[in-house]
Amino acid sequence: MKVAIIRFPGTNCEFDTTYAFEKLGVKTQIVWHEEKEFDADLVVLPGGFSYGDYLRCAAIAKLAPAMQGVFNHAKKGGYILGICNGFQILLESGLLKGAMKHNNNLSFISKNQSLRVVSNDNAFLKNFKKDEIINLPIAHGEGNYYADETTLKELQDKDLIILKYEPNPNGSVFDIAGICDENKKIFGLMPHPERACEKVLGNDVGLKMLKGFLLENFINFNF
């Protein structure tokens, strides 16, 4: 299995993400934002502040040449994971539905956050029980997810909401912390699984999440 991690100017979580996957024995490649072609089974858009989040979060990143490769990967049915700023990029580019607003307190929030697993009928959260409570770090200023009523109904009816905040830290509608697309191949979440990979630092629930992609691709590895 190959994981391509896209690096934009301002990305700051690419090395944490690399560490997490390499800890699982997976080959990774950091792809510069100007590269249009890359070979991967899973594409990850990591956290950070792409292009300084000027205009608004992810507004410029969605136009980067590397996004052409991301779109091509999506058309082939490949897996895509967007973490924090990566989730914002998926929303801005239309690969996932909805939008992000500033946190309702207009402040940057950085803390460990309780989350509820809403759906485990997907590769990403298949290793968790439905309604299981987990903890992951969050660090964002624009994590207030928003969608219109029609989109929210679709997300609910099609089981596309994967994670909810417990309790809500930022005003996100329906407490949404993460969603996926209809094919359950494209995932976006604001919390950072790559920052929860060592028990000595708090927990390693992030590894359990990422491991789902490996099992989906029938990878054999040792822990």
Swiss-Prot record:
It catalyses: N(2)-formyl-N(1)-(5-phospho-beta-D-ribosyl)glycinamide + L-glutamine + ATP + H2O = 2-formamido-N(1)-(5-O-phospho-beta-D-ribosyl)acetamidine + L-glutamate + ADP + phosphate + H(+); L-glutamine + H2O = L-glutamate + NH4(+). The gene is purQ. Pathway: Purine metabolism; IMP biosynthesis via de novo pathway; 5-amino-1-(5-phospho-D-ribosyl)imidazole from N(2)-formyl-N(1)-(5-phospho-D-ribosyl)glycinamide: step 1/2. It comes from Campylobacter jejuni subsp. jejuni serotype O:2 (strain ATCC 700819 / NCTC 11168). GO terms for biological process: 'de novo' IMP biosynthetic process. Residues 2-223 form the Glutamine amidotransferase type-1 domain. GO terms for molecular function: ATP binding; glutaminase activity; phosphoribosylformylglycinamidine synthase activity. It comes from the Bacteria. It is found in: Cytoplasm. Part of the phosphoribosylformylglycinamidine synthase complex involved in the purines biosynthetic pathway. Catalyzes the ATP-dependent conversion of formylglycinamide ribonucleotide (FGAR) and glutamine to yield formylglycinamidine ribonucleotide (FGAM) and glutamate. The FGAM synthase complex is composed of three subunits. PurQ produces an ammonia molecule by converting glutamine to glutamate. PurL transfers the ammonia molecule to FGAR to form FGAM in an ATP-dependent manner. InterPro entries: Class_I_gatase-like (IPR029062), PRibForGlyAmidine_synth_PurQ (IPR010075). The active site is at C84 (nucleophile), H192, E194. The keyword Cytoplasm applies. This is Phosphoribosylformylglycinamidine synthase subunit PurQ.
